[in-house]
């Protein structure tokens, strides 16, 4: 397993290390998943996300080139802004979901999923056109996600009161003690927060300083367990589980991040055919358990309310600390994917009652306003 530059720091803090996407990562610290989850919802938590891939694209035509491969529309953003979207195969299936940050005019940072770094880079490189530079800086840069309602105070305490907070989905390039930081107001928790990208050589120093400065704001280190329960409450998809090359963004209910008005991008024609046929045959639904039973996990069978028909299977699942109930995501036939419809989940041989709910399960009251430009109309 690969190790992030903070591996030794996690072990020192008592992090329980597990394999994830080929990386050794902390699933939790001695504080426990529940405490870590609640810290992010009420104060702040910091996650090591150095396992994620970081590519830089630039040069004349970089934006136009990226727009032929990216489902969203980069023409809608400018320097200091970002956009979420997908790399799609020609069938419209998801190769990866990612955020593209325009950190300077015509210069882009692509942050991709850890297990997809090599595949994504090869795919992008295979489509690269003359004049566009593409580089993989994943091994040279670390990344931390500081998430929670007190994240802005921590940002100010760390970088200085004179440094302006980036807007939501914004990105700023900052200097601190001679070290460059790319700081974006993005995250995977549904709370306000920031993702910091900086040279890996400084990872240990930044981590310990951040924990020291953040302590008075209630900041604690958090692992993958809390990251998963937090993202599940806001129905953010996990690539490889809820998203795959066999599933389109339209099936996943993420058509907002696909701009079919663009002249061309990989997968567009296939998605137009899906729309012309009346929409996807299956849809990703959110469900909540309505009786006391173990929490749902991925690959559990989903049945109709009467238990007679197998409708599909779960892609994600777990316990929601906020709802104090099991929640999950599942692909079901479009006709069965109705909010309020009762279903059954087969949990270890027992049929448990659940109901399809409107996404998301949780909405933070602490989010800054969303800029209009980041969403394709």
Cite the ranges covered by each PLM segment.
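Acidic, proline/glycine-enriched N-terminal capping motif
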Residues: 1-88, 93, 377
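Conserved, structured C-terminal
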Residues: 1-21, 25-29, 103-377
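Acidic active-site catalytic centers that drive phospho-/nucleotidyl reactions
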Residues: 48, 97, 195
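Well-ordered mid-protein domain cores that form the structural environment of catalytic cofactors
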Residues: 73-127
């Amino acid at each position: 397993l690969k190790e992030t530059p903070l591996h030794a720091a996690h072990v020192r803090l008592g992090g329980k290390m597990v394999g994830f996407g080929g990386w050794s990562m902390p699933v939790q610290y001695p504080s426990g998943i529940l405490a870590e989850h609640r810290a992010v919802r009420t104060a702040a938590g910091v996650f090591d996300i150095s396992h994620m891939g970081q590519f830089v694209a630039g040069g004349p035509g970089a934006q136009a080139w990226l727009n032929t491969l990216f489902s969203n529309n980069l023409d809608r953003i400018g320097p200091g802004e970002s956009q979420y979207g997908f790399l799609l195969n020609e069938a419209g299936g998801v190769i990866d979901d990612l955020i593209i940050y325009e950190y300077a005019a015509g210069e882009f940072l692509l942050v991709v999923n850890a297990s997809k770094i090599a595949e994504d880079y090869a795919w992008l490189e295979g489509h690269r056109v003359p004049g566009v530079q593409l580089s993989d800086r994943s091994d040279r840069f670390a990344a931390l996600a500081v998430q929670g309602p007190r994240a802005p105070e921590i940002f100010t305490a760390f970088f200085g009161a004179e440094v302006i907070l980036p807007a939501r989905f914004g990105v700023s390039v900052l200097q601190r003690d001679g070290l460059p930081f790319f700081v974006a107001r993005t995250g995977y928790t549904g709370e306000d927060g920031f993702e910091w990208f900086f040279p890996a050589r400084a990872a240990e120093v930044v981590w310990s300083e951040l924990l020291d400065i953040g302590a008075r704001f209630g900041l604690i280190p958090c692992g993958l367990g809390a990251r998963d329960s937090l993202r599940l409450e806001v129905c953010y998809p996990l690539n490889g589980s809820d998203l795959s090359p066999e599933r389109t963004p339209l099936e996943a209910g993420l058509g907002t991040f696909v701009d079919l008005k663009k002249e061309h991008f990989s997968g567009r024609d296939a998605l137009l055919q899906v729309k012309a046929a009346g929409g996807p045959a299956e849809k990703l639904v959110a469900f909540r358990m309505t009786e006391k039973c173990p929490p749902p996990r991925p690959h559990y069978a989903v049945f109709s309310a009467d238990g007679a028909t197998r409708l599909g299977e779960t892609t994600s699942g777990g316990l929601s600390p906020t709802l104090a109930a099991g929640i999950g995501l599942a692909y079901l036939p479009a006709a069965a994917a109705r909010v309020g419809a009762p279903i059954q989940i087969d949990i270890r041989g027992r049929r448990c009652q659940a109901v399809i709910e409107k996404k998301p399960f949780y909405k933070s009251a602490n989010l800054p306003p969303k800029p209009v430009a980041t969403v394709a109309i």
